[in-house]
Regions:
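Acidic, glycine-enriched catalytic cores built around paired aspartates
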Residues: 1-39, 43-65, 86-89, 94-97, ...
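Often metal-dependent polyanion-binding catalytic scaffolds in large enzymes
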Residues: 1-383, 403-406, 427, 457, ...
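Generic, well-ordered alpha-helical scaffold segments in large soluble proteins
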Residues: 9, 194, 198-205, 209, ...
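Conserved structured core elements
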Residues: 157, 185, 189, 193-196, ...
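Glycine- and acidic
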Residues: 172-189, 239, 291-293, 308-315, ...
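Conserved alpha/beta core surface patches that mediate binding of polyanionic ligands
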Residues: 208-223, 409, 440-445, 474-486, ...
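Catalytic or ion-translocation cores adjacent to nucleophile or general acid/base/metal-coordination motifs
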Residues: 239-265, 450-626
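Conserved mid-sequence domains
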Residues: 356-466, 470-471, 484-485
Length: 765
């Protein structure tokens, strides 16, 4: 195999002790395997290895060899990743099931081509890149992987060898935490080098083969961006960072336009169009490097000129190079002057504290109208009335409290970004831990108090815990009945986005109950939206593993029933998922197409097929309830937190320097479950190779049906429901990736042995 061929190059690299490491490593692997089979402790396995194969090594030399093992294996994994990336188009059928070509042909066979065309005109996939700390590779290593995969694809042995040498000399450990701006720059690389090309390639295909280009106003793909905007639990994200990030996003997309226009200028060398392309190139160049020189610069100017060039080519030059011009036009429609929309996010509890601070200012009445003098003493109902009507121009500088200043400045930053990058530059504000109608209206009021009477902003509540998901319908109905907010929604084309958190939902209620609660919340909110004549979009906060909403994402969206509004698919893509699923042009195009087609398939090609019958719905509910009970009992076990603190990698997450934000929410010295972030929580179970959040409770629940003699109900549900099958497949993925032999020695631990057995018994179910 290619891996074995290129892996052999490691032996030729000019590194100290490389031969010794490569000779000892296979022996160490065999020792570990035997040790696992015998349920030995890790320290005993390592000790037996040195006693047998290197008895003369002192402690220092033993540590050096173990460290060399880690370095060697890390680089082997990088090589494997690069080979996998290079062969992506061979391993995956780029025109097979789930691709646009396949969807187009299936629609034609079912005589649904026109229906498909009309649906794509309004269907949209929104990919939101986040800086959640799940990417352990430093940026320079990611670049090497990219270069290495390109060299492997070309079988360029000389470049491969040089890159392996570079890899050997490049540290994998970050000495310092990245800043929020560092995280932003890291993810902008993917926008510039991957999404810019892959998304426009898909847009070109749709415009050429499915919908006439002139009729396609829908962008199909939107890209969101959280680094530099997500303040939830990250005190290092300031308004200055937000503005700096937005500026960098615009610079990056203009640089890509400039590169494309330079290439186009070499092709458009004939009268009528030549000078227009040259002028456009100069215009973008000036905006990049001399922005003060441009008296007029806007997306409309760029698009109008490009469309004029296109008309000239078609009418006067037989359409020569029109596909190149259309490609740039499509890119401009996709990415505008903003590249990606910079979302702002903050916790509702922070907002409440800030709002209390705002209205408590002794001179507040001189800055606002509609604020009752005794606002804080009012009943909840009266406060809601006041929140809807108050407005003003409150300066952030009149407050000494830093978080109050920063919150108000972040709203001003959104206004500033919209002026420079266009409205899409920053027009979404997410309220995490949203529990009440007041949580939403407090933010609405803060925007109107920031000299923004009619804010061009989508206010997006994020419902995360099981109780919050259950109350989401009541909260949103109160919002839709508010006349001022209703007028705001009309200005937003009567479209409301709601975010649903898979990670914290799973942490709170367990895998099955979280997914089922989110499904039910989507159904309830869809029905509510239909009742009020509103279009509802669901924004899913998903991570990489099934325990955080990951797994087979395409299958998940393809399994949605007609009871859920689905003109949009919106989801977060985090950390390592970005590089693994969207790290190359091939993988990015493939996975974007899969997402696009999954929404189309459930709505156009198989309408009604995924709807749950009353009997199946009852079975789902019973499975969820029993799994929830099992998970809650597990969480309440007195050893739950101590086990994570002392037997897992949880305490070390804060030391990895892979993210800018603190590793836990609260400031308490002791670990509280409520303060525990979903990523270190899920990650710690994953590194124990136990993957508890992805399966715990599911086995107990199904066993309950077996004990009651009702397993046929579960079998019938499995046969009928694609959603249920998807949930089980993803949970089985968590089970498959578990390896309890690694921690079997814990069974003998006096303090934690019984708790380990409890987990293992659930795994065996």
């Amino acid at each position: 195999s290619k891996f074995q061929i290129y892996n052999s190059l490691f032996l030729t690299l000019p590194f100290e002790n490389i031969k010794e490491t490569s000779l000892f490593l296979p022996l160490f692997v065999e020792t570990c395997k035997k040790g696992y089979e015998d349920n030995n402790k890790p320290i005993d396995i390592v000790t037996s290895f040195f006693e047998r194969y290197a008895p003369d090594f002192d402690e220092e030399k033993q540590k050096d060899l173990l460290f060399n093992f880690i370095q060697y294996i890390e680089r082997q994994v990088v090589l494997f990743d690069a080979i996998e990336d290079a062969s992506f188009s061979y391993v995956n059928n780029m025109h097979g099931r789930g691709t646009l070509r396949n969807i187009k042909e299936e629609a034609a066979n079912k005589q649904l081509s026109e229906t498909l065309s009309e649906y794509i005109k309004r269907f949209n996939v929104r990919i939101v890149l986040t800086a959640h700390p799940t990417q352990f590779y430093p940026d320079n290593v990611l670049v090497i992987i990219n270069e290495l995969s390109n060299a492997i694809a070309k079988d360029d042995l000389d470049s491969i060898k040089k890159l392996l040498v570079q890899l050997g000399k490049t540290p994998f450990y970050k000495k310092e935490k990245p800043t929020p701006f560092d995280e932003a720059v890291s993810l902008i690389w993917f926008l510039e080098n991957v999404f810019y090309h892959s998304a426009s390639t898909i847009y070109d295909y749709v415009a050429e083969h499915i919908i006439n280009s002139d009729e396609l106003d829908n962008s199909i793909f939107d890209f969101g961006f959280w680094p530099g905007g997500d303040r939830d639990g990250n005190p290092f994200v300031t308004a200055k960072i937000t503005l700096k990030t937005a500026k960098r996003l615009q610079f990056s997309v203009l640089r890509n336009y400039y590169r494309d226009l330079r290439k186009l200028k070499r092709k458009i060398t004939f009268p009528g169009a030549e000078h227009r392309v040259a002028n456009l190139e100069q215009l973008v160049f000036n905006e990049l490097f001399y922005p003060d020189r441009n008296t007029e610069f806007s997306l409309d100017i760029l698009l109008n000129e490009m469309n004029t060039v296109l008309d000239i080519l078609i009418n006067e030059h037989s359409g020569l190079y029109q596909e190149d011009v259309r490609n740039i036009i499509h890119k401009m429609k996709l990415f505008g002057l903003h590249f990606a929309s910079l979302d702002i996010r903050q916790d509702s509890r922070v907002h409440h504290g800030v709002f209390t601070e705002i209205v408590s200012h002794p001179d507040i009445q001189s800055y606002v109208t509609g604020l009752p003098e005794n606002y804080l003493d009012l009943t909840a109902e009266k406060r809601l009335e006041a929140l809807s009507t108050m407005k003003g121009n409150v300066s952030p500088t009149i407050y000494g409290d830093e978080i109050t200043q920063q919150t108000l400045e972040s709203i001003r930053a959104m206004q500033s970004i919209q002026k420079t990058n266009g409205e899409r530059g920053s027009n979404r504000y997410i309220i995490s831990n949203c529990q009440t109608l007041e949580n939403i209206l407090e933010l609405f009021a803060m925007c109107r108090l920031s000299n923004w009477e009619n804010p061009t902003v989508d206010f997006i509540p994020l419902f995360e815990t099981i109780p919050d998901l259950e109350s989401a319908e009541a909260v949103m109905e109160g919002l839709f009945n508010n006349p001022i907010y209703k007028a705001h929604l009309e200005s937003r084309k009567n479209k409301q986005t709601v975010m649903l958190g898979f990670s914290d939902g799973t942490k709170d209620g367990g895998y099955f109950m979280a997914n089922w609660s989110i499904y039910k919340a989507k159904e309830a909110l869809s029905g509510l939206a239909t009742k009020y004549g509103i279009s509802m979009a669901f924004f899913d906060g998903r991570g990489g593993p099934p325990a955080r909403g990951g797994g087979n994402t395409h299958e998940f969206y393809a399994s949605m029933g007609d009871t859920i509004q689905s003109d949009d698919i919106q989801l977060t893509i985090q950390g390592q998922t970005i590089s693994s699923n969207f790290g190359t042009l091939d993988s990015s195009q493939y996975n974007l197409e899969q997402l696009l087609s999954s929404g189309i398939a459930s709505r156009i090609l198989n309408p009604g097929k995924n709807n749950l019958s009353d009997a199946d719905r009852k079975t789902m509910e019973n499975i969820a309830v029993h799994s929830y009970e099992a998970y809650q009992n597990f969480k309440a076990h007195p050893m739950f937190i101590p086990y994570l603190e002392r037997m897992s990698t949880l305490p070390f997450y804060a030391k990895t320097n892979i993210g800018s934000r603190p590793s836990k929410r609260g400031k308490s010295k002791g670990l509280q479950f409520e303060d525990l972030r979903a990523i270190p929580f899920v990650g710690s179970w994953s590194q124990l190779k136990q993957n508890v959040p992805g399966f715990f409770g599911v086995g107990t629940s199904i066993q309950h049906f077996i004990n009651e003699g009702k397993i046929e109900y579960v079998k019938q549900l499995y046969k009928n429901s694609r959603f249920f099958r998807t949930l089980l497949f993803n949970s089985m993925m968590s089970l498959t990736k578990s390896f309890f032999k690694l921690t079997a020695y814990m069974k003998e631990d006096k303090e934690f042995g019984a708790f380990w057995e409890l987990i293992f018994e659930e795994y065996k179910l």
